[in-house]
């Protein structure tokens, strides 16, 4: 694959002013960021953070439009049908993209959308009811192997990134746990605190108050490396399941065929916004760190990540809603 520098070097000189004009002319009217989920979730919050900074940078209104339904497909279809001029964008998540990708076929994000940048790739924590009694991941696996099907874990819904992270854990550990899907993380956390389920793979901020109150124990973090946002908490891989890593992601997309100069402009402005101290602080409150990525690298990242979760869905016989 030729490098980006080589591609630019081979671009006809007559085309360069056209690319520059496309970038300079953007935006020419208000921009809409579609969120394919209801208001209030992490995707919505991140979209509004970007919208605020884009509006300041572009000196035009940037509107966040929530189009929930169909596991994210309704909002995505709206973006796919939009004019390819950069004035309609989308912030979505791992679970939303899985709804578009399906499970049986090879997936390339560029066949459906134009990837712009990764926004954040937050890890989860293995949140456990204290009554389970495990002190680390290795002990949890030992307990689960001794009692196949006894342990239950909750999630915010079938096919959610937290659900798939737990299924990957069970598969790699060689254990069987019962999945209990909920309509959102709040009800799942309530049952975890009450002891009606044993585990959750949850966003850290979701369980923070329960952990502080001793009602829930954070056993490990699911990322490949420990995060400074959770000081002292070791990873699943370090504490009993080598090779395990699972993170969700939030990212920015546009319709197919948006001119590359406009995509580069948006990606650059997004990276600038994400690296501001105030943005980093707001993301930290969500348990995430900014992860801006160039469009080509991000497209490869999404395709590889979706392929990973497709394998989990097939191997675990999960029927996506």
Where are each of the predicted segments found?
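Hinge/capping helix and adjacent helix->loop/strand transition within the periplasmic-binding protein
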Residues: 81-87, 101-187, 236, 249-282
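Immediate post-signal peptide segment of exported/extracytoplasmic ligand-binding proteins
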Residues: 20-33, 83-88, 141-151, 212-213, ...
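N-terminal (or domain-start) structured segment
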Residues: 22-111, 150, 175-198, 292, ...
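Beta->alpha turn/N-cap motifs
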Residues: 91-96, 100, 155, 185, ...
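An extracytoplasmic/periplasmic, membrane-proximal ligand-sensing/linker region
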Residues: 28-30, 172-175, 260-321
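C-terminal lobe and pocket-closing loops
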Residues: 121, 207-275, 307
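N-terminal secretory signal peptides and thylakoid transit peptides that target proteins
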Residues: 1-12
